Amino acid sequence: MYAVVKTGGKQYRVAAGEKLKVEQIPADIGQEITLDQVLSVGEGDQLKVGTPLVAGAVVKATVLAHGRHDKVKIFKMRRRKHYQKHQGHRQNYTEIRIEAITA
């Protein structure tokens, strides 16, 4: 069984037992969280698509860790004007493990 959930403004296809990194969620390590924005649920060749959410569908997950992604370097330059600007960014994430999908 798999589901498509929305969290942090992004959509993820998840299945039970999977680990994934999502946008930072304010929860403690080891805490069980509920992802209730389920867009679709599928099993085998059956697919249930919500309008926009599947009624009664819930994905339960456990928070494993918090961290930061690798640095993304931004470099701006104006040719012939001796203008250069360096900038960096590291995005925070939360690593979760999908425990159960109920639909």
Curated annotation (Swiss-Prot):
PANTHER family for this protein: 50S RIBOSOMAL PROTEIN L21, LARGE RIBOSOMAL SUBUNIT PROTEIN BL21M
Top-level taxon of origin: Bacteria
GO molecular function term, any single one: structural constituent of ribosome
One GO cellular component term: ribonucleoprotein complex
Record-level GO BP terms: translation
Descriptive protein name: Large ribosomal subunit protein bL21
SUPFAM superfamilies associated with the record: L21p-like
Annotated keywords: Ribonucleoprotein, Ribosomal protein, RNA-binding, rRNA-binding
Sequence similarity: Belongs to the bacterial ribosomal protein bL21 family.
Function: This protein binds to 23S rRNA in the presence of protein L20.
Listed Pfam families: Ribosomal_L21p
PROSITE patterns linked to this entry: RIBOSOMAL_L21 (PS01169)
Species of the source: Bordetella petrii (strain ATCC BAA-461 / DSM 12804 / CCUG 43448)
Assembly information from the UniProt record: Part of the 50S ribosomal subunit. Contacts protein L20.
